[in-house]
Amino acid sequence: MGKNDKKGADKGGKAKGGDKGKDAKDTKDSGSGGKAKGAQSINVRHILCEKHAKKEEALAKLNDGVKFDEVAREYSEDKARQGGSLGWKTKGSLDPKFEEVAFALETSTTNSPKFVEVKTGFGYHIIMVEGRK
């Protein structure tokens, strides 16, 4: 029984490990190939602030549970009237730094946003993604 258990564990381990290794390798080696499976375009919102202090105020509001689109209307220096909505964006259409973090971000809603910060030549961004396709 010990041999059978070991063989079963090895087979299971190889299959699981092989799959994990393959997926990790695909993601690392092919870069955009791994990400392309997830999404070619994203429905993205952002809050753009030129000043670090203003970005920190916006983050505090988000962390206090205020809806993303409401914070965008109050703090964003871009697309404020649309609640920060940039709409559907394809790969290659955004600032490279912005795009890298935006395409890696989980989708969420404005009521309960999952967001990330990034600094680009435009200023400080707080980004959330509403959908991907």
From Swiss-Prot:
Q: Where is the PpiC domain?
A: 39-131
Provide a GO biological process annotation: rRNA processing
Name the catalysed reactions: [protein]-peptidylproline (omega=180) = [protein]-peptidylproline (omega=0)
* Keyword Chaperone listed: no
**Single GO molecular-function term?**
DNA binding
Q: Is Isomerase among the key words of this record?
A: yes
Q: Which Pfam families match?
A: Rotamase_3 (PF13616)
Q: What does this protein do?
A: PPIases accelerate the folding of proteins. It catalyzes the cis-trans isomerization of proline imidic peptide bonds in oligopeptides.
Name-wise, this protein is Peptidyl-prolyl cis-trans isomerase PIN4
Which species expresses this protein natively?
Gibberella zeae (strain ATCC MYA-4620 / CBS 123657 / FGSC 9075 / NRRL 31084 / PH-1)
Specify the taxonomic lineage. Eukaryota, Fungi, Dikarya, Ascomycota, Pezizomycotina
- Gene that produces this protein: PIN4
